[in-house]
Amino acid sequence: VGDVGSRRVGNFERSYEVFAGVVPPRIRNQSTPGADEAQRDLLEIACRHHGIGTAADLADYFRIGITEARPRLAELLEAGRLQMAVVDGWSDVAYLHPEAVRPRSVAARALLSPFDPVVWFRPRAERLFGFRYRIEIYVPELKREYGYYVLPFLLGDRLVGRVDLKADRANGRLLARGVFAEEGVDTGGVAFELSIELDRLADFLGLGEVVVGSRGNLAGPLRSVRR
């Protein structure tokens, strides 16, 4: 344990101070865990947050190597801290947290950051939602499938679309340059909910107008909703 700690104080800012001022006594006075114990604790936390996941899902959450994670997961199973599960359609076995609760309904609506845990581990997002997602900021413009900076749109318990967004701060506009619906969704309903979320985002960013472009299969329905 070092003598100096750091804490975030704002966007991309950190303050450095005496370690005792950063970490509370209940944490500071605990004994330092060994590597195996720390990995077990982190994997259990990952499973609690996921509810259920494969070994790869849980290992990725705290960037633990999969070869290190597998024996720790076996130990958690033996200790009763996790349970084994089988999910239809998954090729790998899954781990279930004993306290996991399946909600009867999910009333969610959000534009997700590319770094949101829902989509960060791409294999899990594709397995759970059938949603193939890649960041295309380093892809040459003519080779991009959806756009430069595309945000997934979560509605209820599904990823129903994606939007290529740009903040035009000079003109006070939020540009939805490309708007795409996933296959099989109600485009009218999705457009209505997405319109509300775009207004919320524009307000948060201090932009006075949302401008919808013509690219994407959801652009037309979204423009119709916003007339």
Q: What do these predicted regions represent?
A:
Residues 1-111, 116-119, 124, 131-135, ...:
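Long, low-complexity intrinsically disordered regions
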